Amino acid sequence: IKFDLAVPVDIEEQARGLRALFGRDRRVWVWGSTRDGEEALLVEAFEAARPPEDILVVVVPRHPQRFDEVASLLAARGATLARRSHAMKIPGSTRYVLGDSMGEMLAYYAAADVVFVGGSLKPYGGQNLIEPCAVGRPVMFGPHTFNFESAAEAALAEGAGLRARDAAHAVGLAMELLDDPARRAEMGRRAAAFALSNRGALDRLQAWLAPRLAISR
């Protein structure tokens, strides 16, 4: 049923607006729906990899009450940070953007080149990996996806997603994808097809339930 999410008709327009804000020449890696403790792991692994300057990381914590906490974490590490809620334009020297706005998760995903879905590096069970697939973006996730296990396994089987063993592996996979536009495009096509082919789950469930509910009355 989680496949039946509504993608706004203007999602690409929203994404273009964010890309203009981020810088059209930047390669954008979105960390979506991250949970407590995951940002620190990802930042440490990302910085250790000494990434090229044109890679911009957009961090979107799962819970709004953690926005300030994550901003403080990044600042404490000396990271160049802009907050979505404050910035009219992101300087080219900025390494991280904190996605501290509400209702823009799909737009962040649509503006990404590569997406990592959080809640999966630590044993939280994962977050909704179908959202980035629905906007045609390559999706990555960690080892802990028990809340979305069937979707995660299906995404892997369809070539729409990649599973990382840990934060360092996630960074390595992301770097490979960011360096390979053709592979990103193919994964994005597969992700969109995967999401589209699984829509209609709610209608199918209702059709299955209807005669059974009628019999029970």
How would you name each of these model-derived features?
Residues I1-R217:
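Nucleotide-activated sugar donor-binding and catalytic core shared by glycosyltransferases
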